[in-house]
């Protein structure tokens, strides 16, 4: 049986600027993302392909290109958990979750809409952050390789909500 690893999200913080209007949340960075020190780092994760399609952008390759694309569209990225114990990238194995300070992030931005990329992210947001922010999140399907049953086309359709009514 695989062992729990303690993960502390100090390798990289939220991606945002003062003009961010939308927040997209994962649960906790995967081992590959922690290694890369950036969000959605697993090569089979479809997040960047989905977002490039939704935003009508060229697929970004570098961290700088990904950051620029998100900022250009006023989209912030972060996670619902700042630390936890986890087996690999399995959200189902999460123990001892510690939430991030989303309330503090909201005070520095124009964020009024929040989306969670998967059931775990949504569960932890609604449990720990919603009571403090008062903003209900929208649950989107996970772009993780573990969620391959959801088609790319369906992901794009769901993720279109992120840009609806966004400046």
Feature map (PLM): residue ranges:
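Catalytic metal-binding/acid-base residues of hydrolase active sites
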Residues: 28-29, 120, 144
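Short, well-ordered alpha-helical microsegments
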Residues: 121-125
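Short loop/turn segments at strand-loop or loop-helix junctions that form parts
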Residues: 27, 80-82, 142
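Short, surface-exposed acidic-centric catalytic microdomains
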Residues: 32-93
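C-terminal capping/extension of enzyme domains
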Residues: 1-21, 43, 88-103, 126-167
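Internal catalytic-core helix/loop-beta-alpha segment
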Residues: 72-120
């Amino acid at each position: 049986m695989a062992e729990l690893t303690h993960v502390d999200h100090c390798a990289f913080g939220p991606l945002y600027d003062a003009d961010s209007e939308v927040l997209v949340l994962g649960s906790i960075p995967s081992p590959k993302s922690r290694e890369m020190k950036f969000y959605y780092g697993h090569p089979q994760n479809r997040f960047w392909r989905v977002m490039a399609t939704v935003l009508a952008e060229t697929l970004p390759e570098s961290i700088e290109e990904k950051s620029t694309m998100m900022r250009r569209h006023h989209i912030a990225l972060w996670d619902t958990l700042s630390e936890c114990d986890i087996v690999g990238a399995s959200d189902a194995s999460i123990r001892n979750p510690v939430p991030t300070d989303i309330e503090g992030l909201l005070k520095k931005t124009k964020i009024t809409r929040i989306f969670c990329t998967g059931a775990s992210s949504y569960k932890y947001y609604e449990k720990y952050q919603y009571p403090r922010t008062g903003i209900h999140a929208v649950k989107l399907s996970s772009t993780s390789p573990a969620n391959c049953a959801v088609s790319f086309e369906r992901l794009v359709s769901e993720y279109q909500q992120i840009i609806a009514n966004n400046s």
